Curated annotation (Swiss-Prot):
Protein name (record): D-alanine--D-alanyl carrier protein ligase
UniProt catalytic activity: holo-[D-alanyl-carrier protein] + D-alanine + ATP = D-alanyl-[D-alanyl-carrier protein] + AMP + diphosphate
Coiled coil feature spans: none
Binding site for ATP: T144, S145, N284, T285, Y286, G287, P288, T289, D365, K473
Gene3D superfamilies to which the protein is assigned, alphabetical: 3.30.300.30, N-terminal domain of ligase-like
Organism: Staphylococcus epidermidis (strain ATCC 12228 / FDA PCI 1200)
Keyword ATP-binding found: yes
Chief subcellular location: cytoplasm
Cystine pairings recorded for this chain: none
Amino acid sequence: MADLINILNHFVQEQPEAVAVRHTNDELTYKQLDEESSKLAHLLQDSKKPMILYGHMSPYMIVGMIGAIKSGCGYVPIDTSVPKERVNMIIDKVQPEIIFNTSDETLEQTNAQVLKVSDIQDSQYPIVFDSQMKQNDVVYTIFTSGSTGEPKGVQIEYASLNEFAEWMVSLNKTGTGKEWLNQAPFSFDLSVMAIYPCLTSGGTLNLVDKDMIKKPKLLNEMLVQTPMNVWVSTPSFIEMCLLLPNLNEQQYSSLKQFFFCGEILPHKTAKALVERFPNSMIYNTYGPTEATVAVTSIQITEEILNQYNPLPVGVARPGTKLFATEEGELVIEGQSVSLGYLKNEEKTTAVFNFEDGVRTYHTGDKAKIEDGLWFIQGRIDFQIKLNGYRMELEEIETQLRQSKHVREAVVVPVYKNGKVIHLIGAVVPTEPVEDNLAMTTHIKHELKSRLPEYMIPRKFEWMEQLPLTSNGKLDRKKIAEVVNG
């Protein structure tokens, strides 16, 4: 099996002065990335616990990742946007010996040794380190939200990461030495889709920070300054960027490939993108954190757009098997599946199975296969009951998005005494709404031809933009707070 450190070493030899990572004017070459990560690996080599990697979009976050891989201890990435209470819960769960803090923020009381960027830069350790990471070692642990409020640490094996990076490089048709855009913070595993495929193809990883996400104008400046070739983001992020009228092939002719993951890619968004970038390759992918980022892919073409709505997530990647249970729940089997949740046997045994050396994960996603392609139909636990009727909120959202008056939509249940009493549609219209009542009546009339009466939202809230989480996904919690007043 491929080993990403060996591949990285190849590019260090071949193109030492090429830029490996860039954030605004802060850059590290392949040589610098190799040397700085080797110095860090020397500091980490006696650590028996994963290293906590704290920060935002500093290139030294990548130094931290590569250094932790070389040392064999692995890493736990935490973005500065993560609330302090949650950071403390993660530190408490991991019990790290070393924290590499690349930010200016001070972490609260911890018994771990805290390293700063200057400690690595000033270190006199040798700039060479032979990687100690074995294929069956845990390379990273990413914490996802738990239903009880306690975050769950998803442990990913080095072999799984290598297999994933190799697959992604095979999907990337732009070639080696390209400019990659990464939107996701490092505590969100979508970032893995950009980091390792980029570095194992000799590319430059360009980091989008939270200010650029808040102000697309800053992102536009970055795109003008550095023409990108490969784009990796959530669908919600590209949806926001499509508000920039000049985000098109004429303006950005170098942008040849898009990868989307993390949430459902709406048909309308994909269609708008295909119209603006007719000669680019647009990939829709699907996968939970528990199965190493993504396990399916499909190139979205005019033909696919004309044939399917909602869009498929494609076919399983090599080495991964997918099947649906009688209830329609998608189960993933293969090397991509995580080793389970860190120090949480109860949660692990509930959704993972490791019998006979075969790893499976029950996703909680509803899925079907049609024409040899997989379709994700929302969360099994995203069903609600209204007046005795069981329904999928995402199905209503899909139908809402069909309207030419709707650019984006989210459906929010309104609860009273723990029971759903009605639904509200939060809608971003394609044009400003002059008469709310008339537009609501019109949309309801449209929905009547596609949905039963009980699934139609009682009222609609018209919004300029739907809020996003720090990961660049739709912030359903915030939307619910806004519409519920």
